[in-house]
UniProtKB/Swiss-Prot annotation:
The keyword Nucleotide-binding applies. PROSITE patterns: CHAPERONINS_CPN60. Keywords: ATP-binding, Chaperone, Cytoplasm, Isomerase, Nucleotide-binding. NCBIfam families: GroEL, PRK00013.1, PRK12849.1, PRK12850.1, PRK12851.1. This is Chaperonin GroEL.
Length: 546
């Protein structure tokens, strides 16, 4: 396959065109007065969104060289989304500004490698300054403000996230699902819930709700199948003598064992329920261990030399309340020791730090939440499917922003923190060529404010000038109310993690693009002309006709 190669000035021009095309489509969404983008879908109704990364992911350009520039900026948005979950539009605006200013200097003959070193140094200075400006999140009010800003000033969403975080704690898991109604609401699952229901509907105690509810019940945790009743006689007799209730969690309960449990339940001899163990393979073993620690049970497992027939009531755990429906089991207020639970939480946190797999991280965080707090589900509803999808995007952004804020703290929003932090560049020393890179970053840090102002129908230069007249680091422009004010008091705040990731990723990709001198792409395929048909005047086979 033949290739097309382009060099130096031509290459940079192509990259800049691609960068500008993508960034111009994305940056209209920035700020409280940013606009929506409508995206055509190959099936279903068009998607309306104000989420930068969603817009960026849809863009593919026809010209291969320009597309390379666009794809590299798309990488900036995606990486920022993966790390911080928000700030994708800011990252795109910064990447465009850094590359645009840098390309001018490289074209004028400056050394791109020295400019890159200057950019990297300046970014390091700004990040240190952002950390020193950071304020920890205090109380649910600030959590609600962060959520509202990321959800395009939707205070209802912000408050909902703050309430959910209050209920499940900062370690808890908050998930977002589409609602079947037009209402958006939060439901909280207290205690530990796993996705396994009762093995027989005969275990149900509440026929109206189709639930088996056990109060002050023992919990048996076993890692193998239970087929024979004789293995369980000892435990069942011990539980029956005390007149207590019992939940059996095992790989499976089948045949004679299940039939005997059902008969005893129907006769009223035993108040009992049985469910399958959650998860698969190694994850199942870990989750059974979690349940055992939460309830104060021992995992009955031959791996540790415990057999079911030798188990006694002392090996069982206890929970104040257990609710089992056809799909889920919820264990509330287990009797596990606080120290054991904290030790297990610490162990899972260490595993989260060590693992590099996003899937494993997600599953470990779910286990952590079930042990440490609980799970909150936000059901997003709206009158139409199009609006519901747009709202779901905003809720996801808001959730990610609030988590980031809790992690690393907050700074003044509206692009102000970057502008204030960039003033530190003037007080730092750079070599002559590196100074150009530092100047590029200083100029790029003004760009988010300029764009927020432009989207609000104002002149960015005038807004910048007004902000810089006041030396307070929290003083800035509130585009929602069109006022110059103390942004933190007004609740216009950004998570430090979001601002940091946006700048780091934008500078990383843009400075690499500046050092590009050659571009190679596949040559477009030439359309081959259709072969002429045999015969005279293209009418072969018809010569005998008059």
């Amino acid at each position: 396959m033949s290739k097309v190669i382009t060099f130096s000035e031509d290459a940079r021009t192509h990259i800049l065109k691609g960068v500008n095309t993508l960034a111009n489509a994305v940056k209209v969404t920035l700020g409280p007065k940013g606009r929506n983008v409508v995206i055509d879908k190959s099936f279903g109704s068009p998607l309306i969104t104000k989420d930068g990364v969603t817009v960026a992911k849809e863009i593919e350009l026809e010209n291969k060289f320009e597309n390379m520039g666009a794809q590299m900026v798309k990488e900036v948005a995606s990486k920022t989304n993966d790390e911080a979950g928000d700030g994708t539009t800011t990252a795109t605006v910064l990447a465009q500004a850094i590359y645009r200013e840098g390309a001018k200097l490289v074209s004028a003959g400056h050394n791109p490698m020295s400019i890159k070193r200057g950019i990297d140094k300046a970014v390091g200075i700004i990040i240190e300054e952002l950390k020193s400006m950071s304020k920890p999140v205090k109380g649910s009010n600030e959590v609600a403000q962060v959520g509202a800003i990321s959800a395009n000033n939707d205070k209802e969403i912000g408050q909902m996230l703050a309430d959910a975080m209050d209920k499940v704690g900062r370690e808890g898991v908050i998930t977002i699902e589409e609602s079947k109604t037009a209402k958006t609401e939060v439901t909280v699952v207290e205690g530990m819930q796993f996705d396994r229901g009762y093995l027989s509907p005969y275990f149900v105690t509440n026929a109206e709700r189709m639930e088996a509810v056990l109060e002050n019940a023992y919990v048996l945790v076993y890692d193998k199948k239970i087929s024979s009743m004789k293995d369980m006689i000892g435990i069942l007799e011990g539980v029956a003598k005390q007149g207590r209730q019992l939940l059996i969690i095992a790989e499976d309960v089948e045949g004679e064992a299940l039939a005997t449990l059902v008969v005893n339940k129907l006769r009223g001899t035993l108040h009992i329920a049985a469910v399958k163990a959650p998860g698969f393979g190694d994850r199942r073993k870990a989750m059974l261990e979690d349940i055992a620690i939460l309830t104060g049970a021992k995992v009955i497992s031959e791996d540790v030399g415990l057999k079911l027939e030798a188990a006694t009531v002392a090996d069982l755990g206890v929970a104040k309340r257990i609710v089992v429906d056809k799909d889920n089991t919820t264990i509330i207020d287990g009797a596990g020791k606080k120290n054991d639970i904290n030790g297990r939480v610490g162990q899972i946190k260490a595993q989260i730090e060590e693992t590099s797999s996003d899937y494993d991280k997600e599953k470990l965080k779910e286990r952590l939440a079930k042990l440490a707090g609980g799970v909150a589900v936000i059901h997003v509803g709206a009158p139409s499917e199009v609006e519901m999808k747009e709202k779901k995007h905003r809720v996801e952004d808001a959730l990610n922003a609030t988590r980031a804020a809790v992690e690393e703290g907050i700074v003044a929003g509206g692009g102000t923190a970057l502008l204030r932090a960039s003033t530190k560049i003037d007080k730092s020393k750079f070599s002559e060529e590196e100074q150009f890179g530092a100047t590029i970053i200083k100029r790029a840090c003004e760009e988010p404010i300029r764009q927020i102002a432009a989207n609000a129908g104002l002149d960015g230069a005038i807004v910048l000038d007004r902000i810089l007249q006041n030396k307070s680091t929290t003083w800035g422009f509130n585009a929602y109310s069109d006022e110059y004010t103390d942004l933190i008091k007004d609740g216009v705040i950004d998570p430090v993690k979001v601002v940091r990731c946006a700048l780091t990723n934008a500078a990383s990709v843009s400075s690499l693009m500046l050092t590009t001198e050659t571009m190679i792409a596949e040559a477009p395929k030439k359309e081959s002309a259709a072969p002429a048909m045999p015969g005279h005047d293209g009418m072969g086979g018809m010569g005998g006709m008059m």
